[in-house]
Amino acid sequence: MKKKYRIKKNKEFQEVFQRGTSMANRQFVIYMLDRPEQPYFRIGLSVSKKLGKAVVRNRIKRYIRQVFLEMKDDIMPQKDYVIIARLPVAEMTYFEVKKSLLHVLRKAGALKRDIK
């Protein structure tokens, strides 16, 4: 995923947390903030050290980025998304992560159309 599609700065994360809306399930919390001036969506990831060592945390982040890469045409543009991974994600496979992420994105209304 290209760097322009990522949220990196703490100030940008804080803006999404404070001004955005949130939706959650057992595995993920997603914060969304509308950005009408931005033609694409951006994602920021937060994976706590409570989830495991660096290898586990990096794997979780790769899984989440891959889901967004595969679904980029179905996710609403002009938004910033911050995804916070919760503890159950540490033991999940890629397909379980994808299913859970799609569930919370659907709940949040972040998908252009309904995807199975």
UniProtKB/Swiss-Prot annotation:
Pfam families: Ribonuclease_P. It comes from the Bacteria. Disulfide bonds: none annotated. One of its GO terms (molecular function) is tRNA binding. Keywords: Endonuclease, Hydrolase, Nuclease, RNA-binding, tRNA processing. GO terms for biological process: tRNA 5'-leader removal. It catalyses: Endonucleolytic cleavage of RNA, removing 5'-extranucleotides from tRNA precursor. GO terms for cellular component: ribonuclease P complex. Its EC number is 3.1.26.5. Belongs to the RnpA family. RNaseP catalyzes the removal of the 5'-leader sequence from pre-tRNA to produce the mature 5'-terminus. It can also cleave other RNA substrates such as 4.5S RNA. The protein component plays an auxiliary but essential role in vivo by binding to the 5'-leader sequence and broadening the substrate specificity of the ribozyme. Consists of a catalytic RNA component (M1 or rnpB) and a protein subunit. PANTHER family: RIBONUCLEASE P PROTEIN COMPONENT. This is Ribonuclease P protein component. It comes from Geobacillus sp. (strain WCH70). The lineage of its organism: Bacteria, Bacillati, Bacillota, Bacilli, Bacillales. The gene is rnpA.
